[in-house]
């Protein structure tokens, strides 16, 4: 069964190892094939936008997902998650789900779980900033001083 994808004007999508850019009008595609990685632009992180530990994990999983040889990213991935679990042990259930999906070869589901890790990280940051307002003010001072 073909996957139906609707693209907004100028939206990009990765199909396999190709980037497809839509023109200035909406487009509807039917993609037929098995085990072809497909990522919409909104789901793609770049090294520049992967600016937190959880986003770096997502980037590593994303690179596994689109790579013909996902194992090339395993070292990076496992180093990142080791550091996260050491710093935030409560993240283990999410990391475990990502790990299981990677080991089972379900990299798309691992990518979805990596999104949950990003959301969890954002939740923890929000809680920290709510209870440590000075930390947020210090962060603003550093960014304006640069």
Curated annotation (Swiss-Prot):
Keywords assigned: Bacterial flagellum biogenesis, Repressor, RNA-binding
GO molecular-function term, one example from the UniProt record: mRNA 5'-UTR binding
A Pfam family the protein falls into: FlbT
GO biological process: bacterial-type flagellum organization; mRNA catabolic process; negative regulation of bacterial-type flagellum assembly
InterPro entries in alphabetical order: Flagellum_FlbT
Family: Belongs to the FlbT family.
Function: Has a post-transcriptional repressor function in flagellum biogenesis. Associates with the 5'-UTR of fljK mRNA and promotes its degradation.
HAMAP family named among the record's database cross-references: FlbT (MF_00783)
Protein name per the record: Probable flagellum biosynthesis repressor protein FlbT 1
Organism: Bradyrhizobium diazoefficiens (strain JCM 10833 / BCRC 13528 / IAM 13628 / NBRC 14792 / USDA 110)
Lineage: Bacteria, Pseudomonadati, Pseudomonadota, Alphaproteobacteria, Hyphomicrobiales
